[in-house]
Amino acid sequence: MDAGCGTGVLGIFCTLKGAKSVWAYDIDRWSVDNTKENMLLNGVKNMEVVEGNASILQGKDAFDLILANINRNILLADLPSFVSVMHAGSQMILSGFYVEDIPLLVQKAKSLGLSYLNHTEKENWATLLFERL
């Protein structure tokens, strides 16, 4: 799943690297349309993109991998929705926030039952990797 897909680059990359299917969403109509255009340009047929926020995850089947490149405040608000569509062994990669946000995001994720695996930092930007046990 590509949450807040923007141009769709993360989801498209996953399909090109062998993902059987990708489901993506964004709150912005332009982003959804742009993702669809980029899917066409890249010959991607096994990806679905819809307009909406994390509330549209309610009732969805679990995903093996969740990717979310979104700012800290939205990530904090959406983490419970993300966890609700993770099964044991699902992984989640979060990005789009600053290094100083790491402790707050790790604390929130752990409080929701996720295991912190790793993080990377580059020029004050950070990425976090979690797994649901």
Q: Which residue ranges define each predicted feature?
A:
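A short SAM/SAH-binding and catalytic strip from SAM-dependent methyltransferases
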Residues: 65-76
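A short glycine-rich, Lys/Arg-flanked "PGG" loop and its adjoining helix->strand segment in the class I
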Residues: 76-91
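Conserved class I S-adenosyl-L-methionine
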Residues: 100-112
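A short acidic, Gly/Pro-enriched loop at the edge of an enzyme's catalytic core
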Residues: 55-65
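Short beta->alpha hinge that forms the Motif I/post-I loop of the SAM-binding pocket
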Residues: 26-30, 70, 97
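ADP-ribose/adenylate-binding Rossmann-like module
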Residues: 89-102
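Conserved SAM/SAH cofactor-binding pocket of Class I
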Residues: 1-55
